[in-house]
C-alpha cells in the first residue's frame, strides 16, 4: 500500500514534466493542472445543465409545473462557486506540501527523462525530416493533377479522384513505415525509463523502508489536514443546498397537488 501511495504521488507530481517530454514549454504545476481540468469540467457541466433546465422550463410541461428550476440552478451554481473559493487555498497547501516532500525523487526522475529525451531526439528529428520529404513528394505528384482539373471539364473529376487514390494510399503506407520504424527505435528507451522508475522505487523499499514509510506518513498527514480544513466549506455547501432542495421540493409538491386537483375536477 505504501508503494502504491508513493508511486501515484510521484507519477502525478512529475506528470507535468512528462507531459512536456517532447516540448520546450514551461510545465504546469500539479495544482494548476488539476485546477484547470476541474474548472473546465465544472463549467461545461454547469453551462450544459443550465441549458437543459432552461429548455425544460420553456416547454409546455415546464410552464405548467412552474418548478422555478432555473432560479434553483443559479442558486446551486453560486453555492458551488463559493465552495471552490473556500477549498482552493486548502488544496493548494496540500499539493505544495506533497511537492516539497517528494522533491528529491522527482528531480531524479526528471533527470532520467531529460537523459532519455536527448537520446531519442535524433530519431524524432529524422522522423520529422522524412515525413516532410514524403509530404513534399506527394504535393509534387498531386500538383499536375490539380492543374489538369482546373483546365478540364467537370467530368474529369472522377478521373482525378482515381488518380489521387493510389497516391494517397502510397503516402499512407510510407508514413506507416516511418512510424513503425520510429516506434521500434524508441521502444528500448521507453523500457529503460520504466526500469529506472521501478529501480528507484525498489531501492526505496529495500533501504530499510524508512524513506518510504516517511513519505507515506507525511502523505497521510497532509490528507488528514486537507480533510479537516475542508469540513467547514463542505458544511457551508450542505447548508446552502438545503434551501435550494427545499424550494424545489415545495414547488414539485405544489405542482403535483395542482395536477391532482385538475384530474379530480374532470
Swiss-Prot record:
Its main location: secreted. Sequence repeats lie at residues 67-88, 89-110, 111-121, 122-143, 144-165, 166-187, 188-209, 210-231, 232-242, 243-266. Pfam families: Apolipoprotein. It comes from the Eukaryota. InterPro entries: ApoA_E, Apolipoprotein_A1/A4/E. Glycosylated. Palmitoylated. GO terms for molecular function: cholesterol transfer activity; phosphatidylcholine-sterol O-acyltransferase activator activity; phospholipid binding; protein homodimerization activity. Belongs to the apolipoprotein A1/A4/E family. Participates in the reverse transport of cholesterol from tissues to the liver for excretion by promoting cholesterol efflux from tissues and by acting as a cofactor for the lecithin cholesterol acyltransferase (LCAT). As part of the SPAP complex, activates spermatozoa motility. PANTHER family: APOLIPOPROTEIN (PTHR18976), APOLIPOPROTEIN A-I (PTHR18976:SF11). Homodimer. Interacts with APOA1BP and CLU. Component of a sperm activating protein complex (SPAP), consisting of APOA1, an immunoglobulin heavy chain, an immunoglobulin light chain and albumin. Interacts with NDRG1. Interacts with SCGB3A2. Interacts with NAXE and YJEFN3. This is Apolipoprotein A-I. It comes from Phoca vitulina (Harbor seal). The lineage of its organism: Eukaryota, Metazoa, Chordata, Craniata, Vertebrata.
